[in-house]
């Protein structure tokens, strides 16, 4: 290999060193200085892993002074090159630049430059890059993008709401599903879609203080969204880093109390430019026209500043009309400004609901009914649709569905309010109560008597709380180490129950973490029962491990012992047996406990076991919950209302459980209230709203489409290939789970999402739902998205060379495989990828420019090729460089036609869809005031910007592979 002092070469194995200069040559060795790093390398002359850097006419080069030049001519003299061309800064022509003065920091980014500079990738990396481009483009085009990656069951009504709301510009909606139907999941799905598509980047979630950790866990575990929890301490810390502490994080959770307590803090929240605000338990925001509460005013102030708002609340019937109006007023104060007018409007929706019911019943419609439908929809062109709906043809059902959609679009608050009920959603289990009455031990009787004497001055509420937990009273006098479990009959009963139901997974819930820990020790030491503990003192990772151990079928824990707070936000649908070791203080907490098992998708009826001690507050509460509210065996939407109305009486009975006079009357009174309120709620059900929120067949089809996508084997093959190339170790753990750990040879030192200890993953949704320690891998998981970014944002796999053993072709025949990318640049929030994601166009050219890509499929062709080592590859490239240049020019001439076709198709699709959506909403605006002006303005503005961006779309060469035919 001829070396001359001053020549520029690049290292094949250490390209990061930049351009090297030959500074010494002797008979056997050559020394290169790499000025950008100041390092020297000594190579053997005969077989050195370096490539001569030679630019060609048309290339742009940079001098060591920083100016650039377009090369027009290359001269060689005594082995040294001089480039002649035009300077780009001064436009001076005929400028000469000797190669010794080239910029040493040169990085070859174009695939052809990397190939000619000897920066040749492994063949499998080229294949991975092409697949990454192909799959990435396909995923952006999926109609349900953003709905597949969450660790949740595919529940149609949840998917329907998320699909509808998640695609809107700055959605402002009220989610008012009944308890247990998954409002939190719906909100998470909407957030996930908006964040993934770029429609939103900054999100604020405001919740009651007790639910902060539940939301934190739920967002992370189900949606891979890592929120920061802001409290007083975190807020104070962040003040050192930014003028507005909330600017330090993109995703924030804080409590309502934290938000409203300080005027400055609320101002900072309002100024933080959030894209989405989520408020949980919004029904607790007290409002009246004359005196709105401070909490309501705080949220109102925020809602004025934040474009998108999701309010999670109890059902409208539970709230009452005025309270319901107050929530809607937060979403759109211009639309909902007059309560009396709102009440009148609601009455007028009855005929619409009747019309929808009529269509869904499938009966033939009379002429009067057809005319009424025509008037309600108010459009001239629906006559054919009405006729089709009333015919016996195959199209009748779809015509009826379309008419139902039109009616719901035009009437009611269906664009801003979503509400599902258990009656309208299938898939809930039965709940069966088993009460176990147990004698009150003498030790407790004594402790209670002494406590009564010593605590005579305590309030009735404090005495009532004490009486719910007699073991705590006993420990107050005997010390924290007192062994109450040795004589408490509930412990004996629990051990007996567990030993006789060894094959059952049992969830045991008690109020205090200390109780859970003591029970675990007793079960382990006395009966060898495997019990996991779950309480608020544990970290999220520790809780995950406990939950995973409980979920293991054969070797896992039989029992999970949970404290009240520790179990918030966790669901254990694989178990159907629950033991309440004690009872919570109010009906909301009781429903929350049962809700750990009573979820959609629960396969078995739920067995609720309540061992209680007679003559204690537990015996009072168990009767009140069961006989007064029917709260164990059915959800109890009336519970809180009745609890508040009888609070004082109930507290007195709990504080003095031996005073039972009048208690039967209280229970009877509560039961009557419960039945009356229930009937009232049923009467007030908005059938029209339920039909819209539920989604019907459309929602079912959406769930089935995603389920089909879950079975896509392409993801598994691609992910394994990706992990191999990044350098991630994979260890099959069985049960459809894989453990990933970093290796010593990673493509990047710290791969986002992969901890030093490794992570457990699964591609199976069912496994992910049962095992909280296993991350659910989909195309939307950060691990895959980060992997795609790592490959596609750099030059991994962008240039390679392969051998094709084919005796039907002459030895030395050249083929060049080109991967172009057609793309447009636009702000992320425009979601341009819906129409034109970066799209690969593959060409396989021979030396005459014939494109063989259509005849030769990529994967089949890839399997026929053999790899070449980098050194041999560099020699081959140098030998055929001129031919490759010629083929590249033929490729450039051909790509324009293919790229233009893609861009035109994207323009037509964008124009058609966005114009249709705008026209639809403008037409609806005339009959349904729930369509906001800012939504129409945003769609029109987005349409214009998207069309402009598509007009500027272009293409570039992303990767190339040189193929040389051989017969050996």
UniProtKB/Swiss-Prot annotation:
Disulphide linkage map = none
Please tell me which top-level EC class this enzyme sits in: hydrolase
Task: List GO molecular-function terms, semicolon-separated.
Answer: ATP binding; DNA binding; helicase activity; hydrolase activity, acting on acid anhydrides
The answer to keyword Oxidoreductase applying to this record is: no
Against InterPro entries, the record matches this protein to:
Helicase_ATP-bd (IPR014001), Helicase_C-like (IPR001650), Helicase_RapA (IPR023949), P-loop_NTPase (IPR027417), RapA_C (IPR022737), SNF2-like_sf (IPR038718), SNF2/RAD54-like_C (IPR049730), SNF2_N (IPR000330)
Keyword field contains Isomerase:
no
GO BP terms: regulation of DNA-templated transcription
UniProt domain Helicase C-terminal: residue ranges: 490-662
The Helicase ATP-binding domain, residue ranges:
164-334
The entry's keywords:
Activator, ATP-binding, DNA-binding, Helicase, Hydrolase, Nucleotide-binding, Transcription, Transcription regulation
Entry's transmembrane regions: none
Give the residue interval(s) assigned to the motif DEAH box.
280-283
Subunit structure and binding partners: Interacts with the RNAP. Has a higher affinity for the core RNAP than for the holoenzyme. Its ATPase activity is stimulated by binding to RNAP.
Give a short account of what the protein does: Transcription regulator that activates transcription by stimulating RNA polymerase (RNAP) recycling in case of stress conditions such as supercoiled DNA or high salt concentrations. Probably acts by releasing the RNAP, when it is trapped or immobilized on tightly supercoiled DNA. Does not activate transcription on linear DNA. Probably not involved in DNA repair.
Q: Which NCBIfam families match?
A: PRK04914.1 (NF003426)
Belongs to which family?
A: Belongs to the SNF2/RAD54 helicase family. RapA subfamily.
In Swiss-Prot or TrEMBL terms, this protein is called: RNA polymerase-associated protein RapA
